């Protein structure tokens, strides 16, 4: 009996200890006693060879409350953002530019394969370029040796003989090694790549490696949200990026341990700005900082069946480049050609799919076979004005993205919203019922107010382009576009986030009886009816100034 009691007591202590540890891990998102919010620009910047990465301090109270972290990535033309994965699900919005993104799902086949014809054409082009270079060099030498004609002719004859000898050797080698080439010649094969452009939303699950490349004619800019409080993150609440190439720097700079920023400098980018690369003395034994760097070089070479020099290249030894590198020439990989007709066909398919979902009342008729793991659809474009879910010709438009539009969001438990408001347009006062909202200002400006449960305005600020602010769950918020209009993108921490409005045709006030309004607000019944029916719009509201201008 005594042994059973001791065992029960020990089990109870272990259970309480685990529960306390779990509560301490989740304490940041449970302690949302926010007295002040602020729209901020990034706090930290890493300068790379072909771009930059900026991050917001995730240790701020509002980020801790929402359980998120955020970064902004700028990739210059012909820049390659090296492969990496994160401990948390990511939602990426393409603010500007176009490019290519590749996501690697372990165990899935390489469905993009180079044909033998294209491979031969590539080799022929390389050989043709070499011959042209040789001809140009030969012409230069001939022009410089015009006075020594006899000696030049002798050298030409010698070169012709050497060229014939080389050609004979090549022909003999090609005739003697056809089977060897067939055995060891490997054409390029890789997993699917995806074209990305402005307005795209890309979902990346935790632990899935991805890379991106800017092949456009302007900078490629993307904003990333890391949902660090997700159940998919079994580590702590700190965002972590695991790079598989290069010599990367810590993007979030271990901001919980970083030096405090001086007052008056909050929100100013470049506080921790550093030149691209990393001093060798900060590294152990001259190794890099990617995942391969920590392995023993000999053991890594044996595992990959390569020589140690190749293994050291994977480890980033003697490589000063960090997260974003510049590609020499053009990045050549297998991708299907895209003409105007193909793009239009893809857009029509997306519109048809959207109409089918609307006809089904927003219901996703899933049978478990509509998408396989290896063919998951990772992106959706919500930048097209024709895709708007809410539109007012005098106020603006709003587009939403959730698990009905992009099924992978059900797995990640994230959703998104993009809005464009005209000058003085108002986003109806509302509260987020089941999610936090992380808002990034794409263009323009707006006045934003956020109110807590005590009726205090914990945010009352004019937000500007490039800033980010957080609206906690259930907190009231109102936004009015400024003179430049207001364009934003909002990350939502729930797969099907929705709001309750305080003004408009579908608002909380419209749903109450007249007598309840009259008694609650000490107004007459006539005033109660005016309060309910004076606003016929739903969410995108025109201002009184706009209505007077129209009249």
Curated annotation (Swiss-Prot):
Alphabetized, the UniProt keywords read: Allergen, Disulfide bond, Seed storage protein, Signal, Storage protein
- Pfam families annotated for this entry? Cupin_1
Point out the coiled-coil segments of this chain: none
InterPro entries, from UniProt? 11S_seedstore_CS, 11S_seedstore_pln, Cupin_1, RmlC-like_jellyroll, RmlC_Cupin_sf, Seed_Storage-Functional
Signal peptide (from-to): 1-20
Q: What does the PTM comment of the record read? A: Proteolytically processed from a single precursor to produce an acidic and a basic chain that are linked by a disulfide bond.
Q: Where is the composition biased (Basic and acidic residues)?
A: 339-350
In what tissue types does this protein appear? Expressed in seed (at protein level).
The UniProt subunit note reads as follows: Hexamer of two trimers; each subunit is composed of an acidic and a basic chain derived from a single precursor and linked by a disulfide bond.
Q: What is this protein called?
A: Prunin 1 Pru du 6.0101
Query: What species does this protein belong to?
Result: Prunus dulcis (Almond)
């Amino acid at each position: 009996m005594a042994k059973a009691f001791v065992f029960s007591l020990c089990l109870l202590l272990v259970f309480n200890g685990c529960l306390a540890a779990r509560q301490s891990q989740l304490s940041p998102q449970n302690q949302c006693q926010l007295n002040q919010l602020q729209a901020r620009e990034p706090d930290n910047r890493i300068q790379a060879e072909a771009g930059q990465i900026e991050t917001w301090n995730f240790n701020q109270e509002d980020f801790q409350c929402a359980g998120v972290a955020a970064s902004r990535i700028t990739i210059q033309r012909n820049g390659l953002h090296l492969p990496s994965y994160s401990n948390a699900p990511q939602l990426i919005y393409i603010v500007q530019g176009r490019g290519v993104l590749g996501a690697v799902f372990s165990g899935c086949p390489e469905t993009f394969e180079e044909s033998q014809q294209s491979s031969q054409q590539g080799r022929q082009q390389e050989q043709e370029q070499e011959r042209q270079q040789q001809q140009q060099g030969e012409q230069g030498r001939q022009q410089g040796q015009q006075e020594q004609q006899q000696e030049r002719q002798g050298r030409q004859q010698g070169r012709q003989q050497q060229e014939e000898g080389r050609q004979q050797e090549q022909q003999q080698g090609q005739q003697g090694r056809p089977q060897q080439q067939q055995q060891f010649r490997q054409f390029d094969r890789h997993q699917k790549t995806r074209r990305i452009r402005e307005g795209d939303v890309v979902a990346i699950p935790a632990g899935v490696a991805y890379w991106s490349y800017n092949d456009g004619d302007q900078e490629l800019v993307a904003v990333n949200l890391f949902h660090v409080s997700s159940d998919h993150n079994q580590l702590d609440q700190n965002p972590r990026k695991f790079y598989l190439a290069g010599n990367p720097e810590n993007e979030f700079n271990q901001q919980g341990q970083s030096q405090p920023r001086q007052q008056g400098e909050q929100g100013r980018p470049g506080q921790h700005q550093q030149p691209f690369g990393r001093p060798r003395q900060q590294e152990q034994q001259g190794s890099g900082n990617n995942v391969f760097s920590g392995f023993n070089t000999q053991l890594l070479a044996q595992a990959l069946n390569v020589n140690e020099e190749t293994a050291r290249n994977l480890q980033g030894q003697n490589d000063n480049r960090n997260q974003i590198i510049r590609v020499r020439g053009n990045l050549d990989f297998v991708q299907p050609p895209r003409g105007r007709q193909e793009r239009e066909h893809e857009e029509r398919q997306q519109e048809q799919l959207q109409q089918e979902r609307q006809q089904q009342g927003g219901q996703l008729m899933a049978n478990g076979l509509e998408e396989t793991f290896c063919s998951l659809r990772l992106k959706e474009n919500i930048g097209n004005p024709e895709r708007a879910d809410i539109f007012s010709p005098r106020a603006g438009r709003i587009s939403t993205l959730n698990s009905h539009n992009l099924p992978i969001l059900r797995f990640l438990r994230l959703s998104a919203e993009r809005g464009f408001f005209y000058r003085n347009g108002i986003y109806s006062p509302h509260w987020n019922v089941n999610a936090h909202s992380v808002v990034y200002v794409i263009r323009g400006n707006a006045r934003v107010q956020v109110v807590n449960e005590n009726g205090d305005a914990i945010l009352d600020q004019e937000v500007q382009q490039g800033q980010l602010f957080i609206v906690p769950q259930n907190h009231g918020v109102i936004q009015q576009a400024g003179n430049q209009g207001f364009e934003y993108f909002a990350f939502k921490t729930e797969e099907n986030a929705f709001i309750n409005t305080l003004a408009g045709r579908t608002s909380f006030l419209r749903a109450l009886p007249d007598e309840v309004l009259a008694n609650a607000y000490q107004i007459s019944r006539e005033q109660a009816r005016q309060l309910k029916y004076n606003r016929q719009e739903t969410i995108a509201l025109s201002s009184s100034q706009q209505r007077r201008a129209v009249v």
